[in-house]
Amino acid sequence: MARLGFQRQGTQLDLASRTWSCAALFSLLFLPVFSKALHVSQPAVVLASSRGVASFVCEYASSHKATEVRVTVLRQANSQMTEVCAMTYTVENELTFIDDSTCTGISHGNKVNLTIQGLSAMDTGLYICKVELMYPPPYYVGMGNGTQIYVIEPEPCPDSDFLLWILAAISSGLFFYSFLITAVSLSKMLKKRSPLTTGVYVKMPPTEPECEKQFQPYFIPIN
């Protein structure tokens, strides 16, 4: 009886393993079909702003009406995929669904506007949008071709003290130049006036012309 019971237990384990193998085979066969049934599109190239912020739209198309969707942003570098951020949201609530310091997102129907913050020049690479239709079944998954995000490092701002020194030097130069021009102009005006007058007033006695003669009146008496 003990041997019979062992055979029955072995038979049950064998049946369970076969069932699990069939389920795994079924998922492997139909997963590519589910992936092809969900098409994900995203822009090819995006240039990040000077503050390290990049935004792009991840849009998916599927005949399956899902109410629960999961969106994941992956970064591909050297043939390796790294998860940047991910969040599951419901389609009915078209609100901000990713609350993270790195990523934010707003869903609107089958479109998701993703924004990645805090990027630097080292973060330049291919960012792939992965969409999963979680509920109701069946499960669908799709990945976009990727968005190449270029991050240009902003030029460092010059030192404010250095700018103040430059401004002070320019102001001093202009002041000295204007002072020099004024001094030269005044000296030229004084030189022009010096031959005409000495600048000292002297009272001179009146002079009589030499040609003027004095005539004495002559009276003729009449008897």
From Swiss-Prot:
Q: Which UniProt keywords are given for this protein, alphabetically ordered? A: Adaptive immunity, Cell membrane, Disulfide bond, Glycoprotein, Immunity, Immunoglobulin domain, Membrane, Phosphoprotein, Signal, Transmembrane, Transmembrane helix
Q: Which residues are annotated as modified residue Phosphotyrosine in the UniProt record?
A: Y201
Membrane topology per the entry is:
Single-pass type I membrane protein
- Supply the InterPro entries for this chain: CTLA4 (IPR008096), CTLA4/CD28 (IPR040216), Ig-like_dom (IPR007110), Ig-like_dom_sf (IPR036179), Ig-like_fold (IPR013783), Ig_sub (IPR003599), Ig_V-set (IPR013106)
Which cellular compartments is it found in? Cell membrane
**Is Membrane one of the keywords?**
yes
What residue ranges carry the coiled-coil annotation?
Answer: none
Source taxon at top rank: Eukaryota
In this UniProt entry, which residues form the Cytoplasmic topological domain(s)? 183-223
Q: Which SMART domains match?
A: IG, IGv
Task: Extract the CDD domains matched here.
Answer: IgV_CTLA-4
Which N-terminal residues, if any, form the signal peptide? 1-35
GO BP, sorted A to Z = adaptive immune response; B cell receptor signaling pathway; negative regulation of regulatory T cell differentiation; regulation of T cell proliferation; T cell receptor signaling pathway
Q: Where is this region: Important for interaction with CD80 and CD86?
A: 134-139
Occurrences of domain Ig-like V-type (ranges): 36-145
**Disulfide topology:** C58-C129, C85-C103
Q: Which residues are glycosylated?
A: N113, N145
| Subunit-level organization | Homodimer; disulfide-linked. Binds to CD80/B7-1 and CD86/B7.2. Interacts with ICOSLG.
Name assigned to this protein? Cytotoxic T-lymphocyte protein 4
- Identify the species of origin: Oryctolagus cuniculus (Rabbit)
